[in-house]
A protein has these predicted regions:
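N-terminal small-domain helix-loop-helix segment of the aminotransferase-like
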Residues: 2-88, 95, 363
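Short acidic capping loops at alpha-helix termini that bridge into adjacent secondary structure
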Residues: 79-83, 103-106, 151, 184, ...
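PLP-dependent aminotransferase-like
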Residues: 99-157
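Active-site phosphate-binding strand-loop segment of PLP-dependent enzymes
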Residues: 135-198
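PLP-dependent aminotransferase class I/II
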Residues: 212-289, 293-296
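Conserved PLP-binding catalytic core of the aspartate aminotransferase-like
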Residues: 278, 290-322, 345
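Conserved small-domain helix->loop->beta segment predominantly found in fold-type I
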Residues: 282-307, 328-337, 367
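PLP-dependent enzyme catalytic core of the Aspartate aminotransferase-like
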Residues: 321-322, 331-367
C-alpha cells in the first residue's frame, strides 16, 4: 500500500475537512435560514424565461464567455481587463492564493471570517492570522495593521462580514489600502454581500487609486444564484493579468454564464430585493421584540439574535426540531449566545417566530 503522506501535499494531508453532502441533502424539507441564500420567491415567468434561453450547445460546446464578460464589466463599470469570473467566490479566493501564497506566508483576517480563507491557507502551509473583532463587532483595523510583518502577503476585510454583518467605512478602507500599499501588501475586500443595502460601492474606486486592492464579489447571495456558482475578482489590469494565469481553462460553465446574463438583464430585481429585505428586517425584529429576544440588524441579508444555550442544548438544535435551520454557533467567546438568521419571506418568519415562542414556553415550564 502506498504512503499517501509521501504523495499528498503536506498542507493538504494534515488538514481536516468535513464532508457536507449529507448535511446539504437534509435541508430540502426545512425552512432554510442558515446559509444566507436568497430564499425569496422567484416569479415563475422569470424562471421560465431563463429556461427558454437554454440551448443544446450550452451542454455540448465549451463555454464562450465573451458576452458574459462584456455584460458583467458594463454592469460593474469596469473594463474586462479588470475582471476575472470564477466558479463562486470560493474559487476567487483560491485564485488569489494560487497566484500569491507560498509556504510560510501570512494572511491576516478579522475573526469571525469566511472559512475558505483558512482552508486554502492550510493547504499552502501558510499562516492565517485571525484578529478578533472589537467590542462593537467591527473589524479592528488598527490591530490588523499592527499584525503585518514581512511575511504578510494579504489582508482580508469582509465588507460586510458574512458572519456578523459589520463593515468598516470606505474612508477607513481607503486609509488601510494606502498604508498596506507602502508595505507591499494586498488588501482584499470581500463584498459577497454587496447589493443587500444598495447598488453602489465606493470601494471599486480603490482599484484604480491604489495598486494593491482586489475586490471579491459573488452572485450567490442577493442575485439568488448560489447553485450556479458565479463569483468574480476585480482589480487593476496589472494584478488581474497575473491572477488570470492561474484560472481554469474555462472560468465558469455555459449554464452559469447564461444564469448570470439572465440576472443582469433584470437588475430591477435588485431594487425589489433590497426593499423586501429592508422591510423583512423591521418586521422580524418587531416580532422578536414581542418575544423579548434581543437582536441586532446587519449590513447583510441576515440578522443576529441572542438566545443562550438551555440545559446544554443550543438554539440550532431546538429550531431544527421545528424544521427551521439557522446559522451554526459562533466560536468566538465574545459572540457566545448570538445566532445568525437569514432573512426570508413573511411565511418563513412566521414559522420561525412560532417555533421560538414554543421553545420559550417550554423553557419557562422547565424552569
Amino acid at each position: 500500500m502506498i504512503s499517501l503522506n509521501k504523495i499528498i501535499r503536506h498542507g493538504v494531508f494534515h488538514t481536516e475537512r468535513k464532508n457536507i453532502r449529507q448535511k446539504l441533502s437534509e435541508r430540502e424539507n426545512y425552512i432554510r435560514l442558515d446559509l444566507n441564500e436568497n430564499v425569496l420567491d422567484l416569479d415563475a415567468s422569470l424562471f421560465n424565461e431563463f429556461v427558454s434561453g437554454l440551448t443544446p450547445e450550452m451542454l455540448s460546446a465549451y463555454p464562450d464567455l465573451s458576452k458574459v464578460y462584456t455584460e458583467m464589466a458594463t454592469f460593474l463599470s469596469v473594463s474586462e481587463d479588470e475582471l476575472i469570473l470564477t466558479n463562486g467566490s470560493d474559487l476567487a479566493i483560491k485564485c488569489l492564493y494560487d497566484a500569491c501564497i507560498e509556504k510560510g506566508d501570512q494572511i491576516i483576517v478579522h475573526d469571525p471570517y469566511y472559512l475558505m480563507y483558512a482552508f486554502y491557507a492550510s493547504f499552502s502551509e501558510a499562516e492565517l492570522v485571525p484578529i478578533p473583532v472589537g467590542a462593537d463587532w467591527q473589524p479592528d483595523l488598527a490591530a490588523m495593521y499592527a499584525s503585518v510583518t514581512e511575511k504578510t502577503k494579504i489582508v482580508v476585510i469582509e465588507a460586510p462580514s458574512g458572519n456578523i454583518g459589520t463593515k468598516p467605512s470606505h474612508q477607513e478602507l481607503r486609509q488601510l489600502a494606502a498604508k498596506l500599499e507602502q508595505r507591499n501588501v494586498l488588501l482584499v475586500i470581500d463584498e459577497a454581500y454587496h447589493h443587500v443595502i444598495n447598488n453602489e460601492s465606493e470601494n471599486l474606486d480603490l482599484i484604480r487609486e491604489f495598486s494593491n486592492v482586489v475586490i471579491i464579489r459573488t452572485l450567490s447571495k442577493v442575485f439568488g444564484l448560489a447553485g450556479a456558482r458565479v463569483g468574480m475578482l476585480i482589480g487593476n489590469e496589472a494584478i488581474v493579468h497575473e491572477l488570470y494565469k492561474v484560472r481554469p481553462l474555462y472560468e465558469i460553465s455555459s449554464l452559469a454564464a447564461q444564469a448570470a446574463k439572465w440576472r443582469l438583464a433584470h437588475t430591477s430585481l435588485l431594487d425589489a430585493y433590497q426593499q423586501e429585505i429592508s422591510a423583512a428586517k423591521v418586521k422580524l425584529i418587531e416580532g422578536l421584540n414581542r418575544l423579548d429576544i434581543p437582536s441586532k440588524t446587519t449590513e447583510g441579508n441576515f440578522i443576529i439574535i441572542y438566545f443562550p444555550d438551555t440545559d446544554g442544548v443550543d438554539l440550532y438544535t431546538l429550531l431544527r426540531s421545528h424544521h427551521v435551520l439557522i446559522g451554526k454557533k459562533y466560536e468566538l467567546p465574545a459572540l457566545q449566545g448570538w445566532w445568525r438568521i437569514t432573512l426570508g419571506n413573511d411565511l418563513h418568519h412566521e414559522k420561525l417566530l412560532s417555533a421560538l415562542s414554543t421553545i420559550r414556553q417550554q423553557i419557562r415550564r422547565i424552569n
